[in-house]
Structure formats: C-alpha cells, structure tokens
Regions:
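Bacterial N-terminal signal peptides that target proteins for export
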Residues: 1-9
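Bacterial N-terminal signal peptides
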Residues: 8-17
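A domain-level signal for caspase-like cysteine endopeptidase catalytic cores
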Residues: 22-118, 149, 164, 168-179
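A short, glycine/acidic-enriched catalytic loop
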Residues: 114-142, 146-162
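Active-site-proximal C-terminal subdomain of hydrolase catalytic domains
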Residues: 155-291
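Preferential activation on post-signal-peptide N-terminal prodomains/segments
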Residues: 288-431, 456-473, 526-529, 534-540
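Conserved histidines in hydrophobic membrane contexts and catalytic metal-binding motifs
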Residues: 373, 442, 514-516
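Charged, low-complexity helical/coil segments in non-catalytic cytosolic or luminal regions
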Residues: 450, 456-510
Length: 541
C-alpha cells in the first residue's frame, strides 16, 4: 500500500514537473509573421516570408530563406491583441499559443501602424505594458529569440526634436537618461520589462517608418546576399529614407561584443543576457553626404539594355564552384563561408572578411575609412568611372546599466559602411540611381579591415529604345491618385533616377522611376495616416 501511494505521488510530481517545463529552444529557423492592418501591411507580412503578396503575386526578390519553416498568422482574424500579450501579466494573454501566439518561433516579424506605446492588431491595439517575450517559465512557454517590428515610433528613443532634423525621435544618440515622455523617449524603460533574459533582441523604428516590399527586400538582401549580421541587416534595411531611424535593443554583459547585436547568423539558442541594456542604431558620417543633384527632367529618356557584369580581373585568380545561379570561391573565411561569391545572372560580386571588434580601441578618422574603402575597390578591380563620392554611415551601440537609477550612458562604434552610387549623364546632367543595385558598398571593421563588400552593377550594352519622359506634375498626380485621404498627407520629399535591382535578380532593362514620400500633415496622427512611399514610372510608353 505504501509503495502504491509512493508510486502515485512520484508519478504526480513527475507529471507536474513536465507540465511546468517548456522546450528549451524554439525550432531552428522557424519564423512567423503577422499584420496589424489589412492595407498594404498584409502584403508586407507575406512578402517577408515568400517574396509574394497575399494573393501570391511576386513582389520582392529577396525574402526569408526557402529552407526555413514559415507561417503567416492572423490572416482573416480580428482583434488579435491577446496573441501579443503574456498571461503572466494579463489573464487574457495568449502569446504562448502554438497556432497564433507570437512568443513561439525563433523569429517573429510584425508589419502595421504603431505609436510609441501601442500598435494596431486588426481592430484593436496591443499595448507594450502587457507584453513579455522569451519568458520560458512555467506554463508561459515563450521561446522567441528575435522580435522584429516595422511600425512608426514603437521603438522611439531620444528627444522628440533634433537640431536640423524635421522628424520626431530621429536622434537616439542624444538620449539623456530621462524617464519616458513625449519630449524624451526612453526605449529602455518601455521595452526593458518586455525583454526576458532568453530573448536575443527586439528591433523596430524610433521614427516614422514605411513597410512594404522594398523594405523586406532590402533586409533580406543584406542578410542573404551581402553578409550583414542580424542587427545590421534589419537596421540598414529599414533605413531606406532619411526620416526612418531603426534600432535594436538587447540585454547583455559589460562587453558589447558578447551580446546578440553581434550575431552573424540567426540562432535558436537563448541569450546569455546580463546586467546591461544595449541598443544599436545608425548614424551618418559628419564629413560625407549623398550628392544633391540639380533636378532637371529631360524631355526624352533612354531605356538601356543590361547584361551581367564581367568578373573583375583581380578575382579571376580564385577557384570557384558553381551551384544554381551562384559561383562560390573555394577560399573561405572561418565561420562565415566562401570569401567571394558571384551571382551569374547579374554579375554581382560579394566579398567577406573577418569580424573584428576591440572595445578599447579608438576608431579611425572618417577620412581614413574613406581612403581605405577607395583603395579596396581599386585593388579588387571594382572601380567604375560613373560613380558618386561615398556616403558614410556608422553603426553605434549605446549601453546603460539595468540596475542603476541614473545609469552612465556609454557609446561604442561597431562598424562603418561606405556606399558609392552609380550615376548616368544625360544632356550634360547627372541622373542618380535608386534601388538595391547600382551600388558599391564597403563595410569595414573599426580597425579598417574588411567585414563585407559588394558590387551590384550590371553592364550597359546599348540603348534599346527611347521614350518621352513624364513631367514631375504628371508623375506627382499619378502618385497622389493612389492616396484616398489626400488632405491628411503632404509631400515630404521626392527623388527620381534609374532603378537597378538587387544582385540576385535577372534584369535586362534599365528604366527610370519617380519616388514620392508622403507623410501625415499632423505628426500626432501617424497611427491613422502612416507614411506612404509611391513609385511611378518615369517613361511614357
């Protein structure tokens, strides 16, 4: 009898222990997306996964790797905020559900309208105060590792206004340690409680954001093709316009290089965490800026025939193996893969180096990075005649203590990138390029050594035909016709130029486009009227 009771008690204890535990890690390379609005954001959430819109039409050439396990959640549902909530905070929380909960995969991506303390969830809104991510404790069963969000201001950080910048919360580096308020946003205060120790990072936009196929395409082009690490791929990918300042936040120890902000690839392992918060954001060089062109639209615009770029002569000494559309060098960078890869359908070239970071070393002067980048492209045979002066950016990490009431704010440079843009001359006027091609990009470690480099630059064979060009007024009116609530929007800026695609795209023609950036007239109504980016063909065909 005693043995029977003991057996029953042991079985009960075992059952309770198993029930109270959850899987240590999520499934490797598992990704789920959700949309908070059924406007273009439902397409964005699908494009992130497959490169298609919600109806299956191809729309983005780069997307989540094909080998990953993918799910687009909440399609056809309404009032989905409970799937973002943790039941340890609110009884309604269901973020641990295997079907619709966001706290289950390795990576979760959200696209929709937002504001500093909330974001839309298909009819209602989710508030940050009800969220906890990666908390695999008891029955919470949260195993998320990476949380990516494309919304306006949900990750707002720093002062509302910055000198010389007309957009709110565009300078996270000027954060002064104040509590979260409308005038000084504090991402540590709002997102700190959400970051349970196992979550590796959460990323979003400090400023206004636009989220569609162009943004998801650039994020995955950065990661899949250019070799950017996880945080860099998101931040650079979402920073397509001057008014968009993304950032990532994580917990970690004293040494910044030991944090997930240095994840070269996605992992389903938990974050070792630590007693510090770290954020990463992008900052422009003080000494360089993109070229400003005199905007004169010619009466006629050539359409050019493109062919793949020949392999640069200095790279012909390497041995390559071919697989599908790619050539991979047999030389490898330890822990990163082939030192060189070439896309055969475009001729795009990608080069890798070792990642180096010394927290105590002083970064170089900006002019030294520019000189090193120019020397590299010359030595590797990447130089072109029709090229802009480089625009320089730096990735910056900000660190504070999680425990001190008035923490010391410290900053570190993580790496720098120099970007050279292609140009075409028409009627003695310089026409710029837009898109993910027509670029030479050199990412350097702080000591000036190579981390990543790419040249996406198809060769122009000849002019295939010439068309009349649309005037600015014609293109603007076409763009405006796509906005229903015209009185709620204003034109913030616009550009035009020839559009070259990412390096893994088969592109045989080079055409010009107008790109119009519309922002809300009332900045306080961004959740109702988020930014709109509208692209219009510049040709009358």
């Amino acid at each position: 009898m005693k043995r029977s009771v003991l057996y029953i008690l042991c079985s009960l204890v075992t059952t309770l222990l198993v029930a109270s535990c959850c899987p240590k890690n999520p499934a490797p390379n598992s990704v789920k997306t959700a949309h908070g609005n059924t406007d273009w954001h439902i397409d964005t959430a699908e494009e992130f996964l497959t490169g298609n819109d919600i109806n299956g039409n191809p729309s983005a050439s780069n997307h989540c790797p094909d080998t990953w396990t993918k799910t687009h959640m909440h399609v056809g549902l309404t009032n989905t905020n409970t799937y973002y909530y943790d039941k340890g905070v609110t009884a309604a929380g269901q973020d641990n559900l295997s079907t619709n909960g966001i706290d289950k995969p390795m990576l979760f991506f959200y696209a929709g309208h937002g504001a500093p303390t909330l974001f839309n969830t298909l009819g209602n809104s989710a508030y940050l105060t009800n969220m906890r991510l990666g908390n695999c404790q008891g029955s919470n069963d949260g195993t998320l590792r990476y949380y990516w969000q494309c919304s306006c201001e949900v990750f707002a950080h720093g002062p509302k206004t910055c000198t010389g910048i007309p957009y709110d919360y565009a300078c996270p580096g000027d954060f002064d340690g104040s509590p979260d308020s409308d005038n000084m946003r504090n991402v540590y205060e709002r997102w700190g409680p959400i970051l349970n120790p196992a979550l590796r990072m959460a990323c979003g936009s400090s400023t206004l954001a636009y989220c569609h196929e162009g943004e998801t395409n650039k994020i995955w082009d950065n990661y899949n093709n250019k070799g950017y690490d996880v945080a860099d791929a998101f931040i650079d990918g979402l920073h397509r316009y001057t008014w968009n300042t993304p950032l990532c936040i994580t917990t970690g120890g004293l040494f910044v290089s030991g944090t997930p902000l240095f994840d070269n690839t996605f992992t389903n392992a938990p974050n070792p965490s630590g007693s510090y918060y770290h954020i990463q954001y992008l900052s422009n060089f003080a000494t360089t800026a993109p070229s400003i062109f005199e905007v004169i639209i010619p009466e006629f615009l050539p359409i050019y025939e493109l062919i793949p770029l020949p392999l640069p002569d200095p790279l012909r000494k390497y041995k390559f193996v071919e697989k599908d559309d790619w050539m991979y060098s047999t030389d490898e960078i330890k822990g990163r893969g082939p030192a060189i890869k070439v896309n055969r359908i475009s001729g795009a070239v990608y080069l890798l180096g070792e990642q180096r970071f010394d927290e105590k070393a002083k970064p170089l002067e900006e002019k030294e990075y520019i000189s090193l980048a120019e020397r590299f492209i010359e030595n590797q045979g990447l130089t072109e005649k029709d090229i802009s002066k480089p625009a320089g950016t730096r990735m910056v990490i900000q660190r504070i203590s999680r425990e001190e009431k008035q923490p010391d704010i410290q900053k570190f440079q993580k790496n720098v990138t120099l970007t050279f843009k292609r140009q075409i001359t028409l009627d003695s006027k310089t026409v710029p390029f837009v898109g993910e091609g027509g670029l030479i990009s050199i990412q350097l470690n702080n000591d000036g050594t190579l981390f990543n480099a790419s040249k996406v630059w198809r060769q122009i064979k000849e002019i295939s035909r010439t068309t009349r060009a649309k005037t600015y007024e014609q293109a603007y009116n076409e763009a405006l016709a796509q906005i229903k609530e015209r009185d709620a929007y204003k034109l913030a800026d616009w550009t035009w130029g020839y559009e070259e695609q990412a390096g893994n795209v088969r592109q045989t023609e080079l055409k010009a486009v107008f790109i119009f950036n519309f922002l809300p007239v009332d900045p306080e109504k961004i959740i109702d009227y988020p930014p709109r980016i509208i692209k219009i063909s510049a040709h009358i065909e």
